[in-house]
Design a protein with these regions (language model features):
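Radical SAM enzyme core and accessory elements
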Residues: 14-25, 41-45, 86, 300-324
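Conserved residues at the C-terminal ends of beta-strands
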Residues: 1, 39, 96, 127, ...
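Radical SAM [4Fe-4S] cluster-binding motif and immediate context
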Residues: 65-215
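Glycine-rich beta-alpha loop elements in corrinoid/cobalamin-binding modules
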Residues: 1-54
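Short aromatic-enriched loop/helix-cap "lid" or pocket-rim segments at secondary-structure transitions
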Residues: 53-55, 63, 138-139, 168-169, ...
């Protein structure tokens, strides 16, 4: 409970410490470490929590590469980041607090990607918040993967479809089938909700881009929706679902809002009537627009989507059901 309390206390602010140190010698040593929260010791001070000043952000290129031995990761997904941060301000995301984007040195990235290619890792998932927010960075990585493709490894990227350029679309169209898969967060098509969560989106362009990518038949596309957002009730979410479903992605994920501590959404949750679980993942239970019963119904719909759509086992049945 103490660890949980301190973690929640620290995450309630704009914490961004990335280095780890071992401290010994009592409270004075702890106070000298920037970017931590700890409970003071001593008579009458057990309930006092101290938080030290923020530390400077670490150079992303200085972080060590952790996958020098591929053995433990055989037949497993490897997670990798070439950038950290996001220029956008989506209110449910912690990256909205600080809009800085830091890039790992591109030569270092290429060297590390080559390691994955040389060892024929099955899948590498980039954890970059919006991989293509820096267009030159994205293009250089996609070109490198195309030129050094081993015919085995798949790379997963989370992108913003409505900022893809014509040049980027042409690069993607020329990739080996299965080399890349793209996850695109549509989240909602409700304009009022998009404005409230500070997520400007061109839904028409997203639709065109997804269709364009689909024409090449070489990239697995995964589209996301989020239930439980402000101003989106059950009927509105149904409209969002219909729009995304009509884009015919390979995977359609119906997710549920997570009210992350420290995010703008957390600060405004009470005003939205949002109730959520008190422990991680802090998932929405109801809102002023969506009842608990409707959330439960959406959970069942999520299971149906996984079973009948995402399993890809009902490709002949679903078109018939859609007409009925």
């Amino acid at each position: 409970e103490t660890f949980r309390e301190l973690t929640e206390y620290y995450c309630g602010g704009s914490a961004s410490g990335e280095e780890n140190r071992t401290a010994g010698g009592g409270e004075e040593r702890l106070h000298a470490i920037r970017g931590i929260a700890y409970r003071r010791s001593g008579p009458g001070r057990e309930d006092e929590i101290c938080r030290t000043p923020e530390r400077e952000l670490t150079d992303l290129s200085a972080l060590p590469f952790l996958y020098d031995d591929p053995g433990p990761f055989e037949n497993k997904i490897i997670y990798y980041e070439s950038s950290r941060g996001c220029p956008f301000r989506c209110s449910y995301c912690l990256s909205s607090i600080d809009k800085k984007v830091r890039l790992r040195d591109i030569d270092t990235v290429k060297k590390e990607l080559q390691f994955f290619l040389d060892h024929k890792i099955n899948q590498v998932k980039f954890t970059d918040r919006t991989f293509n927010c820096d267009h030159e960075h994205a293009k250089e990585i996609w070109r490198y993967l195309a030129e050094h493709d081993n015919g085995v490894t798949n790379f997963h990227f989370e992108i913003a479809a409505d900022i893809l350029t014509e040049e980027e679309l042409n690069i993607l169209a020329g990739l080996r089938p299965g080399l890349v898969q793209l996850e695109i967060g549509v989240q909602t098509v409700n304009e009022e909700t998009l404005r409230e969560i500070r997520r400007p989106s061109d839904i028409d362009k997203i639709r065109r881009v997804v269709g364009r990518i689909g024409e090449a038949h070489n990239i697995h596309v995964h589209l996301d929706l989020i239930a439980g957002q402000p101003f989106e009730g059950y009927e509105s979410l149904g409209k969002s679902f219909d729009v995304v479903y009509s884009m015919k992605p390979e995977q359609l994920q119906l997710g549920f809002l997570k009210v992350l501590k420290g995010s703008p959404m957390h600060e405004r949750a009470q005003g939205y009537g949002i109730k959520y679980t008190s422990r991680p993942p802090y998932e929405v239970l109801c809102t002023s627009w969506l009842s608990f019963e409707e959330i439960c119904r959406l959970k069942r719909i999520e299971e149906v989507v996984e079973l009948y759509y995402n399993s890809n086992q009902f490709t002949h049945t679903l078109p018939v059901l859609e007409k009925s």
